[in-house]
């Protein structure tokens, strides 16, 4: 089953997450099919902390991918931010 979830990167005490489409049997930070965005929870003020390719998320969900709860929350937040800016 395909799932879109967070893959952790960064260093100790400085997390950085990639939003990836991957098989649910793969490890959290393991092999993935496509990187669809990133999330930086400790980004400095004025820098971009979240970017998601919403068209690619829609493509993967249309092909049966599930969103993890954290990714679902981030997608809602980002789509509201994008629609407010437009």
UniProtKB/Swiss-Prot annotation:
**GO process terms (BP):** translation
Matching entries from Gene3D superfamilies are given as: 3.30.1320.10
Q: Where are the transmembrane segments?
A: none
Q: Has UniProt tagged this entry with the keyword Lyase?
A: no
Specify the superkingdom: Bacteria
Family according to the record: Belongs to the bacterial ribosomal protein bS16 family.
Name the UniProt record assigns to this protein: Small ribosomal subunit protein bS16
